[in-house]
Amino acid sequence: MEFEIHLPKEPLLVAVSGGCDSMVLAHLLYEANHDLMIVHVHHGLRKESDEEAEAVRAWAEARRVGIRMTRLEWEGQAPSQAACRTRRYAFFQEVMAETGRRHLVLAHHRDDQLETLLIQLIRGEAGVDGIPRIRSFATGQIHRPLLPYSKQQLYDYAKARQVVWHEDETNAGTKYLRNQMRHRLLPLLAELRPGYEEATVQAAMVRYEQKQEHLKYVTSYVKEQMTDRGLPLEAIQKLPTDFRRLVLRALLPDHDFTSEDYNRFLTLLRVDMPSGEVYYGNWRIQRTYGYVTCVRCPEKNLLPEALEVGIDLGTYHYGEQTITFSRTTTGIPFSAVQFPLTIRSVLPGDRIRLAVGTKKVSRILVDAKVPRASRAEIPVVVDAAGQVLAVIGHRIAIFGSFELLAESCLMIEW
């Protein structure tokens, strides 16, 4: 049979394990004169992997096709399938960045699609729509052009064209859920409902296309409703529940989400909750004062180091803030200040002097509706005695009658 392969006319990175599926994919793309580079990962778990890696290298070199290979080291550990996948895709991403090839091509086929759909179903995942044919990845996209074709069709092609491959013996076992699906459930379904494969894959494709259209609408809606303070909760609540789930996808388009992830997001949106936050990887989605914001979590060691300000004063840069210190006739009396001054982040217990008494800096930031997660990033100016002289962007300390009697004062501007 003839395979219809639709891929960009750009340089491709093709993942090849040495098995039938990926060797057929490489053969098809080579015969179609695509600009290929092979990428191979030796997982370091089976003795046969040495032979497979050498066979992939020989295939590429015989055709003068570029190849990048790596061998994973586990230091005596027995890695899970998820750990192998994470490191495998990390290598793909690394090669894409180094070579500038934006299109990664994988050899998933129709049988893989059926297994994935059933696994999603029995796990109760929110989106039972299988493996996407194209999706964003790293600096480009992942393509799976063999999804319409069955494993048997790939075997038939390999035999007819004398494509050499290596069989991974672990695929014949039933240790993993996917293998149990492959060897026990799929044959039973084929017996009970001949032709179910095409109907199931087609239904999943329709579901996926509908979901993409819905996501396109929600993404556009989110962009239209977004304000400087974030996405208004009221705007999200106007959407149907299924569309509210997709707001999460619109905010974090490069993440994969489970049903539990979506449920945590929907719980965050509940009207009876005044505020809250949920985390997805190194991203934080926060609900504060009627708005939903999505920000990358700052690492503690990324907060700026404290800066010392001497008696000569001048202009200083703390993070993204520019702070100028000068001598004037109004402001904080020099007689009330002990040098050197320090610019640093807010600390628990910080208080600032006002016209009547003092006030916690944390309360000032709450009153100013600064999100909890952003408060540590607000700089304060303190003197050598620990007095808070300014909360940058919000308040200057007030020294009352001392200011009226002072001949020389400190001005802090931002």
UniProtKB/Swiss-Prot annotation:
It is found in: Cytoplasm. Keywords: ATP-binding, Cytoplasm, Ligase, Nucleotide-binding, tRNA processing. GO terms for molecular function: ATP binding; tRNA(Ile)-lysidine synthase activity. InterPro entries: Lysidine-tRNA-synth_C, Rossmann-like_a/b/a_fold, TilS/TtcA_N, tRNA_Ile_lys_synt, tRNA_Ile_lys_synt_N. It holds the Pfam family TilS_C. One of its GO terms (cellular component) is cytoplasm. Signal peptide: none annotated. The keyword tRNA processing applies. It catalyses: cytidine(34) in tRNA(Ile2) + L-lysine + ATP = lysidine(34) in tRNA(Ile2) + AMP + diphosphate + H(+). One of its GO terms (biological process) is tRNA modification. ATP binds at S17, G18, G19, C20, D21, S22. The keyword Hydrolase does not apply. Its EC number is 6.3.4.19. Ligates lysine onto the cytidine present at position 34 of the AUA codon-specific tRNA(Ile) that contains the anticodon CAU, in an ATP-dependent manner. Cytidine is converted to lysidine, thus changing the amino acid specificity of the tRNA from methionine to isoleucine. NCBIfam families: lysidine_TilS_C, lysidine_TilS_N. HAMAP family: tRNA_Ile_lys_synt (MF_01161). Belongs to the tRNA(Ile)-lysidine synthase family. The N-terminal region contains the highly conserved SGGXDS motif, predicted to be a P-loop motif involved in ATP binding. This is tRNA(Ile)-lysidine synthase.
